[in-house]
């Protein structure tokens, strides 16, 4: 069985880990970093960038750079790039493809299976969309687990002999979750979960952006938010200021030539204090308090019973957030986990549980939202209450609302509101063939089945006729099987293009390196090389130079090999008499051409890894 990777597919950054020797290890990406920006950028020539290289050029290419796509998972949102629409699943799959490739490079083997985390408060549509993204990227998603639960796994793996209750406060780039868990004897039981899928670090950035923009507008009469390039510079500066204010009491925001008018160029030079930052973002911090209260209430425990507070997500580095949690709980948060990496580490632990590498661990998670159906009068009738341990299955008997009714439409809803229309409709299906009878007589058994991923299946059975209908919830906002298959094929095609482009870059790197080494060595050896031998080497050298910028990679490889062999033969003659090492001829190393492949930070090699020409 191959390795199963654990992926934290984040709003702002993503992280991947794997179990090695019984311990979870965070995998560094091709740029040498432990996290990868969840950013995708499309270039004018159709090429595609993912990760840090995409983020670096977002200011100059704001229209075709996609950030925070996770906030649109499970919705009908589309990204229009040059007339082609991309779903959130497809954009997320591009990020997952890079993560998958980085993991394969690290492990030295193909990776086809993964455990992916989602915010605990993600609904069914959002979970299904995440699973679809994995499939498009070429990954079989064995398990979807909640981020706070994953963090608890990372925290509690070495503390399984003790019994205690913990509160996980997870404030990421785009979502907020809070979960109450009980740990003991290898069992990680989620008692309750709550959250806000529209609260995260992006919102803190937006507050700072608005503050800068309003200050500038008051002074200059220009709204920078109407200029896409200026807006992107504002976003980058706001994020940088937020990060700096986590460790400093004041930061300077300096953006020269941000715009211009008839009077000339305009600049931003603004000092932002931590006190001011806390003031403009206080409402966001306070929004996280109510979900904590609800989670404690649902778990039926008091704050005094919580023994440990775990902070997860990069946004928990904001001092005001830490202070708010401390004030609410009366406890100092634990420093035992890395907020950026612990979710991926926990996902890797869960992967280890699935493979049997991690033993004596049982994870009991819950469904975050109430599930039910719409009944007479538009009422949402619950079947499975929120915070029910999953997997679970529950049935309930319903009947017809009219005389001689031969079919019923069942509207599956998810949410906490009393009326069905106020909740999220996950899907509809029809049970036909009901025997005509007075209303209230037919017995229709509706069954909800939630698997360990939190994904829902619903069935309806007419107990009188035996007629049955069922639905695996795939809301209209998700991709159907044909769309997923099409996206998978496109992703495979792009992966093949990536492979070819990388091979081309490496072949050209090898040729360039060899040409440089040969010319350098010939100059340094001078008269030690006979005219006849020099002519032979020069002939092969010129032959390689003539074709190295062409498209025939096999010819370039052949010419590279021929030049290598020819020069090695010549240098052997020169050094044989002196008893030297021919590989040291003028610093020449016949294998040095391959050295270009060993430089992971070479821009050409790295960028080629994840550029795709959509027109091919």
From Swiss-Prot:
InterPro entries: ATPase_NBD, Chaperone_DnaK, Heat_shock_70_CS, HSP70_C_sf, HSP70_peptide-bd_sf, Hsp_70_fam. Keywords: ATP-binding, Chaperone, Nucleotide-binding, Phosphoprotein, Stress response. Coiled coil: none annotated. The keyword Nucleotide-binding applies. One of its GO terms (molecular function) is ATP binding. Induction: By stress conditions e.g. heat shock. The modification Phosphothreonine is found at residue 175. Residues 579-616 are annotated as: Disordered. The keyword Nucleotide-binding applies. It comes from the Bacteria. Gene3D superfamilies: 1.20.1270.10, 3.30.420.40, Actin, Chain A, domain 4, Substrate Binding Domain Of DNAk, Chain A, domain 1. Residues 599-616 have a biased composition (Basic and acidic residues). It holds the Pfam family HSP70. Belongs to the heat shock protein 70 family. HAMAP family: DnaK. Acts as a chaperone. This is Chaperone protein DnaK. The gene is dnaK.
């Amino acid at each position: 069985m191959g390795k199963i990777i654990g992926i934290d597919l984040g709003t702002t950054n993503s992280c991947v880990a794997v179990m090695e020797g019984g311990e979870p290890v965070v995998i560094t990406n091709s740029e040498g970093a432990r996290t990868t920006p969840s950013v995708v950028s499309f270039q004018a020539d159709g090429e595609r960038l993912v990760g840090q290289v995409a983020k670096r050029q977002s200011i100059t290419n704001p229209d075709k750079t996609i950030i925070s796509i996770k906030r649109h998972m499970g919705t009908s949102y589309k990204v229009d790039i040059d007339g082609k629409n991309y779903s959130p699943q497809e954009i997320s799959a591009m990020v997952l493809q890079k993560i998958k490739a980085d993991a394969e490079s690290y492990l030295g083997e193909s990776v086809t299976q993964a455990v992916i985390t989602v915010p605990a408060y993600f609904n069914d549509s959002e979970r299904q969309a995440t699973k679809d993204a994995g499939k498009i990227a070429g990954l079989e998603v064995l398990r979807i687990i909640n981020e706070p639960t994953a963090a608890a796994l990372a925290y509690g793996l070495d503390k399984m002999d003790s019994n205690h209750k913990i509160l996980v406060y997870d404030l990421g780039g785009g979502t907020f979750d809070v979960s109450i868990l009980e740990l003991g004897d290898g069992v990680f039981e989620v008692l309750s979960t709550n959250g806000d899928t529209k609260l995260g670090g992006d919102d803190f950035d937006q507050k700072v952006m608005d503050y800068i923009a309003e200050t500038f507008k008051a002074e200059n009469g220009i709204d920078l938010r109407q200029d896409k390039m200026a807006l992107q510079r504002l976003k980058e500066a706001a994020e940088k200021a937020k990060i700096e204010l986590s460790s400093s009491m004041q930061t300077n925001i300096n953006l020269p030539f941000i715009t211009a008018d008839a009077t000339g160029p305009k600049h931003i030079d603004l000092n932002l204090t931590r006190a001011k930052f806390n003031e403009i973002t206080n409402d966001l911090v306070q929004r996280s308090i109510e979900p904590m209260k609800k989670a404690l209430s649902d778990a039926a425990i008091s704050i005094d019973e919580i023994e440990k507070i775990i902070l997860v997500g990069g946004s928990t580095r904001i001092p005001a957030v830490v202070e708010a949690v401390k004030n609410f709980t009366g406890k100092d948060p634990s420093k035992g986990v890395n907020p950026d990496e612990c979710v991926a580490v926990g996902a890797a632990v869960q992967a280890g549980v699935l493979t049997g590498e991690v033993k004596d661990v049982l994870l009991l998670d819950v469904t975050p939202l109430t599930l039910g159906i719409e009944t007479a009068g538009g009422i949402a009738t619950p079947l499975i209450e929120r915070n029910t341990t999953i997997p679970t299955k529950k049935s309930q008997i319903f009947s017809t609302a009219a005389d001689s009714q031969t079919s019923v439409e069942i509207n599956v809803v998810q949410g906490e509101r009393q009326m069905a229309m106020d909740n999220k409709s996950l899907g509809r299906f029809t049970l036909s063939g009901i025997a005509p009878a007075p209303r209230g007589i037919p017995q229709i058994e509706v069954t909800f089945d939630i698997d360990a991923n939190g994904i829902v299946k619903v069935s309806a059975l007419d107990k009188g006729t035996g007629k049955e209908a069922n639905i695996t919830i795939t809301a209209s906002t998700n991709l159907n099987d044909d769309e997923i298959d099409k996206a998978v094929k496109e992703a495979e095609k792009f992966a093949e293009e990536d492979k070819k482009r990388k091979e081309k870059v490496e072949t050209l790197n090898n040729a360039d390196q060899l040409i440089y080494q040969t010319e350098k060595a010939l100059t340094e050896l001078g008269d030690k090389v006979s005219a006849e031998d020099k002519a032979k080497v020069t002939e092969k050298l010129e032959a390689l130079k003539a074709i190295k910028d062409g498209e025939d990679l096999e010819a370039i490889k052949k010419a590279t090999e021929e030049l290598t062999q020819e020069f090695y033969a010549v240098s052997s003659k020169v050094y044989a008499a002196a008893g030297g090492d021919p590989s040291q001829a003028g610093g020449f190393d016949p294998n040095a051409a391959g050295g270009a492949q060993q430089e992971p930070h070479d821009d050409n090699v790295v960028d080629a890894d994840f550029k795709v020409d959509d027109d091919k």
